[in-house]
């Protein structure tokens, strides 16, 4: 998560945004590579193995955050015990996944950016008009094409890659890139998204992760520590824990000071 990665991501954002903004037909040409005009469908979406691979990709991505989520739940139950996972790891993984694959994707753009999916546009024998990535005035009402939630989730694996040991980090970043690209390619092959939907999803995820990593691990003014996070969670969950112990006839004092 260095400045080189940031500059590459911003450069790609600029190039892809301008190129596909000026020549939106490129999105249609890339989508057409997966379309069978004779069958009037995107045939790969009916392939059982491809469908399983799509589901498995999401299971793999979510598996990276399960330990952090479980550790947070256990901390809520037993705030008197130390966190089982590093505090910064929990905050970093949960915050980046929530923002990139949740808030920015499904709760914001996909709900209000009315771009129809490839499978329903006129060029692929659907009823709706194609619109370029930058135009929110499409006829899609909900769960729209821009930008891809599954693409954002797949590329979110940059977050656990950023926490890999330094000697393994380049390989982890490469694996996250391949994983995100393969998952995004499947979404395109199913007619679920255009190239710009998945590419921008990946870039948004990367930028969210880069900023969160800098705030949590690097910048002195915002940098957190595992101990501070553990102490803050103890204070947060202590009142409920104390009330539960009182119901069991056990009197305990206030939360331990940091």
Map each language-model feature to its residues.
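Interfacial segments of alpha-helical transmembrane regions
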Residues: 74-112, 173
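Structural signal for the C-terminal ends of transmembrane alpha-helices
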Residues: 22-23, 70-82, 162-168, 211-217
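Membrane interface segments of multi-pass transport proteins and intramembrane proteases
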Residues: 36-43, 47, 69-85, 220-227
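Membrane-embedded catalytic cores of phosphoryl/pyrophosphoryl-handling enzymes
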Residues: 2-13, 130-255
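Transmembrane alpha-helix boundary/anchor motif
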Residues: 21, 25-29, 103-108, 190, ...
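N-terminal transmembrane-helix/juxtamembrane module of multi-pass inner/ER membrane proteins
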Residues: 2-69, 110-113, 117, 127, ...
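Membrane-interface interhelical connector segments
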Residues: 112-139
């Amino acid at each position: 998560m260095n400045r080189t990665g940031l500059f590459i991501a911003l450069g790609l954002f600029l190039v892809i945004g301008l190129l596909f903004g000026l020549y939106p037909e490129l999105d249609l040409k890339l989508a057409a590579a997966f379309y069978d005009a004779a069958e009037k469908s995107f045939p790969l979406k009916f392939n059982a193995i491809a469908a399983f691979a799509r589901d498995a990709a999401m299971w793999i991505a979510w598996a990276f955050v399960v330990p952090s989520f479980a550790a947070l739940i256990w901390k809520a139950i037993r705030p008197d015990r130390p966190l089982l996972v590093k505090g910064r790891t929990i905050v970093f993984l949960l915050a980046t996944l929530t923002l990139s694959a949740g808030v920015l994707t499904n709760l914001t753009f996909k709900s209000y950016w009315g771009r129809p999916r490839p499978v329903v546009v006129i060029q692929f024998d659907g009823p709706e008009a194609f619109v370029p990535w930058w135009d929110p005035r499409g006829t899609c009402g909900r769960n729209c094409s821009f930008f891809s939630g599954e693409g954002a989730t797949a590329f979110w694996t940059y977050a656990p890659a950023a926490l890999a040991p330094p000697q393994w980090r380049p390989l982890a970043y490469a694996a996250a890139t391949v994983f995100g690209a393969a998952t995004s390619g499947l979404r395109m092959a199913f007619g679920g998204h255009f190239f710009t939907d998945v590419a921008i999803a990946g870039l948004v995820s990367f930028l969210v992760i880069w900023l969160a990593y800098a705030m949590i691990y690097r910048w002195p003014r915002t940098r957190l520590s595992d101990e501070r996070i553990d102490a803050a969670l103890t204070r947060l969950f202590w009142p409920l824990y104390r009330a539960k112990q009182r119901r069991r006839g056990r009197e305990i004092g206030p939360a331990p000071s940091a």
